Amino acid sequence: MASNGSAGLDIDMDGRYGPTNNELFFYVKNNLRFYKLIAEFPKNGKPQWVHISYSETELKNNEKNVFIAVSSGGRTRYLPYKGNEHLIK
């Protein structure tokens, strides 16, 4: 999965000292403009951190990609949020 991090357009957020990662994930998903939103490696329905990517080009195309990152066989898989909502509570 490509990243916009080198251009300063990605951020990883951890709600350790404020809102929970679930609250961050759902707030961004429901209220903000983004290109890619990833709930990273949830445990017991709680993401370990939240990855947000912004791209003006993709925003013009009205793209919003929401994923859940999981580890499987030592590899990271990005599952579409739709159909896997049960992994995030």
Outline where the language-model segments fall:
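Catalytic cores and adjacent binding grooves of peptidoglycan-active enzymes
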Residues: 2-9, 15-89
